[in-house]
Amino acid sequence: MELDVLTAISPIDGRYRGKTKALAAYFSEFALIKYRVQVEVEYFITLCELPLPQLKGIDSGVFETLRNIYRNFSEADAQRIKDIESVTNHDVKAVEYFLKEEFDKLGGMDDYKEFIHFGLTSQDINNTSVPLSIKEALEKEYYPQVEELIAQLKTYATEWADIPMLAKTHGQPASPTRLGKEIMVFVYRLERQLATLKACPVTAKFGGATGNYNAHHVAYPQYDWKQFGNRFVKEKLGLEREEYTTQISNYDNLSAIFDAMKRINTVMIDMNRDFWQYISMEYFKQKIKAGEVGSSAMPHKVNPIDFENAEGNLGIATSILEHLAVKLPVSRLQRDLTDSTVLRNVGVPFGHIVIAIQSSLKGLRKLLLNEPAIYRDLDNCWSVVAEAIQTILRREAYPHPYEALKALTRTNQAITESSIKEFIEGLNVSEDIKKELRAITPHTYTGL
C-alpha cells in the first residue's frame, strides 16, 4: 500500500494529518535533511568569512547563491540525498556528497569542495539541526497555539467573572467561588509554565569528533575555534553552543524543554478534566451540530469527546516527552547511538500536543453556560455559608462558634436557607451582627 492518511501507521500522519501537517516542516525526514543542508551551507560560509587561507579566493557574492540551496530545497533534492545514502549507508555523509554535487553545478567551486563538512562529525550537524528544528517549531507552531488556548480561556474568565459557583473539594461542596476565577487559575498556570519554557535556552553541540576541535586545531592552530563555534552557532543558527561536550550534545537543555512541555501538558490535562466534569454536572451544555452522532446505540448522547480526545493525546505526548527527557542526557562514555533513533521521534509529542490543543479549543468553543444548573446547586447547599458565619462569630468572641456550626451542618439532614436563618435568629448577638449574617448567601459568599 502507498503511504497516505488511510495507510499511515501513526494517527498523527493518518487520521489527524489535517491537524498536524504544519509540523512536517520541522520534524519530517525531509525537514531534517533540509536543516542539515542549511547547517552545512552556513558553516561553509562562516569558514569563508573567517577566512581560512584556502577560502580567500571565494567571492562573497556567491554566498546568497549557496543559501538558495537550502532556501529552495525540494523533495527532489531530498530524494537525491536519500539515493546517495542508499550507497553510503550514512545520512550525514550523503548530505555532504549532495552539496559537492551542487557546488559542481555552480562552477568554479572545485577547489573549495573539501571544506564542506570540514573538521566536523555527524553530530555537529545533527545536534545543531535538531535543536534548530525544535526552536522554530516552538516559536512558529507551539507557542502560538498555546497562546491561542490561553486567550480563549481569558475570554471566558472575563465573560463569566461574576458567575457564582459551588466549589468542590474532595468531590464535596466547599466555600463558593466564581466560574471566571476558576478558569483564571488555568490561565495563570499556563502563562507561568509557558514563561518557564520560553526561558529555557535552546543549545547545540558543535566541537568535532569528541568535542575538542581536534581536527580544526591540528589543521589551523592559529584560530580560536571555540570562539568561532560560539559565534557560528549563535549568529548563524540562533542557538547557544554547549561549551563542554563529548561527541554529542549533553541534551540537558533539551531535557529541560521537554520537562517544561510536560508541565504544560499536565495543566492542560487538569483543565480538560475539569471542563469534562462541569459538563457532567450540567454547568455547561454543548452546541449541537446537525448530522453528528454521539453514540451508535443511544440517540440522545452529546458527549464531551473533544476534552477526552485532548486528554488522551496529552497523555501520550507526556509519556514520550518523559522518555526523551530522561534518556537523551545519558550516553555511554563519549557517545553511543541510542540518541539517534530517539531524536527522530522528537516531533511525535509535538504532534499529539497540537492535536490536543486543537481539540481543547474545539471543546471550549462548543460550551454553552447553563446558569440555572449552577444556581440550583448553590441554592441546594446552604451549609457552605457555615464557614462565613462561624468566622464572623469568632471575630465577635462568640463562645464556641465552630462547634455550634458543626453541630448544625455536619449531619445527614438537608441544610436550607430557613434552617440557617433560624440559627442566626437564635444567636445571642446584636441586631447589627444578625443583619450582617443574614446578608450571607451561597451566591454572595464568593470571596475576592
Where are these regions (language model features)?
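Catalytic-core signal marking the mid-to-C-terminal active-site face
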Residues: 2-29, 64-71, 293-448
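Glycine-rich anion/phosphate-binding loop at the beta-strand->alpha-helix junction
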Residues: 193, 240-242, 246-332
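A helix-coil-helix interface module used to build multimeric assemblies
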Residues: 2-213, 220-232, 294, 307-309, ...
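Alpha-helical coiled-coil oligomerization motifs
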Residues: 158-161, 202, 276, 283, ...
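Generic, well-ordered alpha-helical scaffold segments in large soluble proteins
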Residues: 42-46, 98, 102, 137, ...
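Short amphipathic alpha-helical segments with heptad-repeat character
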Residues: 135-143, 147-150, 154, 184-187, ...
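Proline-centered turn/helix-capping motifs that create local helix->coil transitions or kinks
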Residues: 104-110, 198-201, 280-283, 318-322, ...
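Active-site-adjacent "gating/activation" loops or surface patches in catalytic cores
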Residues: 223-247, 251
